[in-house]
Amino acid sequence: MQIIDGKQVASQVLEEVERDIARLREQGITPGLAVVLVGEDPASQVYVNSKVKKCAELGMNSRKIVLPSDASQEELLRIVRELNVDPSVHGILVQSPPPPHIDEAAVVLEIDPAKDVDGFHPENVAKLVLEDETGFVPCTPLGCMRLLKAAGIETAGANAVVIGRSMIVGKPMAHLLMSKQANATVTVAHSRTKNLPELCRSADIIVAAIGRPAFVTADFVKDGAVVVDVGINRVEDASAKRGYRIVGDVAYDEVAPKCRAITPVPGGVGPMTIAMLMANTVKACRQQTGA
């Protein structure tokens, strides 16, 4: 059984990104990422700070813009419009989820698709479906594909089941797996899917992205399957230092022995998300500057 080490693969991606940034800087170009946060959600603050820190480590410019939790929709849209026309900013990310009074879809629509390094704008969604590589793919599914490639997993002709149909992971993951580059046969499962364990047992590759701790158990998985666990769930644990531990959507201890390969949580898909965000930002910089 192979444990797919996301930290190691992310490190390789970031080394490539750092080399790309160094080459761009030799031409007088420094990629720039702007991250906008509305409110004081502690988890969002951690995510934003980790992105800003990673930019600095790689030699990339970053800008963190924090708005109060009662900031208006129009105020947020105004900032996005300013960033759209700022030539020093190549990637724009509005940290999700925003406060309830903010219309997230409207914010995504306001971001220039050329700077939408999250890959959520309808133009980039269309490019993913059309397999137009000038678009941006959401970072988590892009990272999952890189993990499969790094682990030497053959996707062509494989039966893949993606559990979850979100715009952030499930749907783009399905499109990536069925693309002409991957050539898998894909089933997307969700809360209304019948006989889910039986369906999953037919899969060579399972991608779990539903946000339910330890949902995928051993009876979902055939011997020799590959399991990619996208879930990041906090579970109360009095014995843990913080009072909780992080677990995935897969019951790792019982599923792993059956697998040909599996991603752990933490240390699997998680590190790939920020690595692919950095890669998307460099790609955006290149496309905008013609470098």
Swiss-Prot record:
It catalyses: (6R)-5,10-methylene-5,6,7,8-tetrahydrofolate + NADP(+) = (6R)-5,10-methenyltetrahydrofolate + NADPH; (6R)-5,10-methenyltetrahydrofolate + H2O = (6R)-10-formyltetrahydrofolate + H(+). Its EC number is 1.5.1.5, 3.5.4.9. The keyword Ion transport does not apply. NADP(+) binds at residues 164-166, 191, 232. GO terms for cellular component: cytosol. Pathway: One-carbon metabolism; tetrahydrofolate interconversion. The keyword Chloroplast does not apply. Gene3D superfamilies: Leucine Dehydrogenase, chain A, domain 1, NAD(P)-binding Rossmann-like Domain. One of its GO terms (molecular function) is methylenetetrahydrofolate dehydrogenase (NADP+) activity. Keywords: Amino-acid biosynthesis, Histidine biosynthesis, Hydrolase, Methionine biosynthesis, Multifunctional enzyme, NADP, One-carbon metabolism, Oxidoreductase, Purine biosynthesis. It comes from the Bacteria. GO terms for biological process: L-histidine biosynthetic process; methionine biosynthetic process; purine nucleotide biosynthetic process; tetrahydrofolate interconversion. InterPro entries: Aminoacid_DH-like_N_sf (IPR046346), NAD(P)-bd_dom_sf (IPR036291), THF_DH/CycHdrlase (IPR000672), THF_DH/CycHdrlase_cat_dom (IPR020630), THF_DH/CycHdrlase_CS (IPR020867), THF_DH/CycHdrlase_NAD-bd_dom (IPR020631). NCBIfam families: PRK14186.1 (NF010783), PRK14188.1 (NF010785). Catalyzes the oxidation of 5,10-methylenetetrahydrofolate to 5,10-methenyltetrahydrofolate and then the hydrolysis of 5,10-methenyltetrahydrofolate to 10-formyltetrahydrofolate. Homodimer. Belongs to the tetrahydrofolate dehydrogenase/cyclohydrolase family. PANTHER family: C-1-TETRAHYDROFOLATE SYNTHASE, CYTOPLASMIC, C-1-TETRAHYDROFOLATE SYNTHASE, CYTOPLASMIC-RELATED. This is Bifunctional protein FolD. The gene is folD.
